[in-house]
Amino acid sequence: MKKLITIFSLLAIMLFSISTAFAANEKITMMDEDYNLKNIHTLAIYTPSYKPSALSIERKAKLPNAPELITPDMLTDVIFKVAKEDEVTYTLLSDKDVIQNIKATTGTDISTLSNREALSIYKNNIKNYADAYVIFTFANDSRVVMFADVYDAKDNHWICSYQIIGGDTEDDNLENYSMFMHKFFRILTIQSQK
């Protein structure tokens, strides 16, 4: 009987350690400890920076029924869907809305400019439409990683940075990015309640 209990105990410890080893690792860093996240009533979503993983591109080329390659627009849709599911307390503003507003007020269509020029004009004008903006960056190498950098729209200073690194079993797909977004909005809500 003692051996059986010992075996079950060791098995439970092994299963727990394996699940912990493959779990996603997340971290939030507050760059401005004095900034009150409760001041964010409108959060603008800048076009996510995303490049498909080499494995996803290879699968798409070789397999006829491979999943469709993810695009930044698909990620933006996931962001809004997750925010609605999580019932965030602030208004989200899409990059398309901001681009249209900038075009209407300045006459400049930033979607036709280089990334550097577009971001510069975006930063100069975003204060007219939102309290803060977030730039999502997705990296796909040996692990799937998502970064979310939140900036104050008034003076473009860095408020906080969120990073989540997927486990070894995570894949370059919308389900994982949706899970990452849920965690981001959840931790942003927790930070705003402090």
What are the language-model segments listed below?
Residues 54-118:
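N-terminal segment of the mature soluble domain
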Residues 3, 48, 95-97, 139:
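Histidine- and/or cysteine-centered catalytic micro-motif in compact active-site loops
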Residues 8-17:
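Bacterial N-terminal signal peptides
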Residues 23-44, 50-55, 87, 120-129, ...:
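C-terminal/domain-edge helix-coil "capping" segments
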Residues 132-134:
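Well-ordered beta-strand positions
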Residues 1-7:
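Positively charged n-region of N-terminal signal peptides that target proteins for export
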